[in-house]
Regions:
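Conserved acidic donor-binding segment of nucleotide-sugar-dependent glycosyltransferases
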Residues: 293-294, 298-305, 314-319
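Carbohydrate-associated surface elements
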Residues: 148, 170
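Short hydrophobic beta-strand element within catalytic cores of glycosyltransferases
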Residues: 278-281
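Conserved donor-binding/catalytic core segment of Leloir-type glycosyltransferases
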Residues: 143, 182-200, 206-210, 219-220
Length: 383
């Protein structure tokens, strides 16, 4: 009954596989399966053209063209509501009557350039911005992973409030959770997760491990590019996101550390918090909405070795603070980043978009109400 109801909404799921967006894709494809969505992976469309445009310094155009091709495939397959990630793939989406877009993102191109130290869009910039404004005028709903991102959308593109929706990403708190009977190791276990070691500040973590004061502390480096180091460095190169081995390792650790130099809303910080780990992290992008400074961890203004060394020492010397902030981290995720909360918001937005492209008949209204109610019962029964 639930599946039949939600299949009446012809949903296209068009997703990006860059960095943490692979995790968004994987979880959505599983947790939105009741819609039987038409699934399209952006990188499968116009891959060669995207690589050519990137080679000649027009990476943003390549991403937009690939997004357009994937969205076109979804429309040709009958999709009326297209859930698309990310904003960088959305500017050239086909704006057809009877089709509505929902675009999920974590930063604008301006934030991307400023936060990640890249170049601005240059000559195509005004055209790309104009296309995003056309998307806005077409009725697109913009899902925002953080308030930081939503504020930028409002300021840069004057998007009205009724087309903006805060939607923090989620973790399954039944999978990502503290160990029930955690064995306390005499050696504290510190966790770092990051694919791009330089951008994520791994050099600072390696330097911390070399300090004599931390010789009895174990540092776990989860990255396909993790390198060997002193004996208390433990590289984990083969762990994949959402794998049981990664969940197990995370729940076995005591503290999460991420001296990131450029970020938006890192999912690893959410997963660590769900497992009851406080964090020492740099306040980039929307991170302050994930880690509450002084409550669920410590948010530092810059990626400086001295600052991270001092904070790590403070946590290791104060077991009550370490445990207390870990409990608060778990509670913060339960309240703000649970699968139930994320899905209830997302189903409501999808239903709203579906209504906007169909005749406002009683049948459609009943379908939408039934879809929301059925989904709420399903998600609530899962927690």
């Amino acid at each position: 009954m639930i599946r039949a109801t939600q299949r009446r909404i012809e949903l296209g799921l068009v997703t990006n596989a860059s960095a943490g967006w692979k995790t968004v894709r994987r979880r959505w494809e599983t947790d939105l399966a009741m819609y039987a969505p038409a699934v399209h992976h952006i990188e499968d469309h116009w891959r060669s053209l995207a690589s050519v445009t990137e080679r000649f310094g027009a990476r943003s155009i390549g991403h937009a063209l690939a997004g357009r091709a994937a969205a076109r495939a979804a429309i040709d397959g009958g999709a009326k509501v297209i859930l698309l990630s990310t904003l960088q793939n959305a500017p050239l989406a086909p704006l057809e009557k009877g089709v509505r877009y929902i675009v999920y993102g974590d930063c604008t191109s301006t934030q991307l350039a400023t936060n990640y130290g890249g170049k601005t869009l240059g000559a195509p910039g005004s055209w790309i911005c104009a296309r995003i404004r056309r998307l806005k005028e077409h009725g697109c709903i913009f899902l925002c992973m953080s308030q930081w991102y939503q504020d930028a959308l409002r300021e840069e593109f004057e998007i009205p409030e009724n087309q903006l929706q805060i939607l923090p990403f989620y973790v399954d708190t039944e999978i990502w959770k503290p160990q029930a009977n955690k064995i306390r190791n005499a050696r504290k276990q510190i966790l770092f997760i990051g694919g791009d070691l330089a951008r994520k500040g791994a050099d600072i973590v390696y330097e911390l491990a070399r300090q004599d004061k931390f010789r009895d502390v174990d540092f776990h480096i989860v990255s396909p590019h993790a390198e060997a180091g002193p004996s208390n460095i433990h590289p984990h190169r083969g762990l994949t996101s959402d794998s049981l081995d990664l969940v197990r390792l995370t729940s076995e650790c005591d503290l999460f550390i991420l001296p990131t130099r450029a970020d938006a809303s890192p999912i690893a910080a959410l997963e660590a918090a769900a497992c009851g780990l406080p964090a020492i992290i740099t306040g980039r992008g929307g991170i302050r909405e994930i880690v509450v400074d002084g409550g669920t961890g410590t948010v530092l203004p810059e990626s400086k070795f001295e600052a991270f060394e001092k904070e790590l020492s403070t946590y290791l010397d104060n077991s009550d603070m370490l445990a207390g902030r870990g409990r608060c981290a778990r509670l913060h995720v339960e309240q703000n980043n649970s699968k139930t909360r994320h899905m209830q918001i997302l189903h409501g937005v999808i239903a709203r978009a579906a209504v906007s492209v169909q005749s406002p008949t009683a049948g459609v209204a009943d379908t939408v109400r039934e879809a929301i109610g059925a989904t709420r019962r399903v998600t609530e029964s899962a927690i």
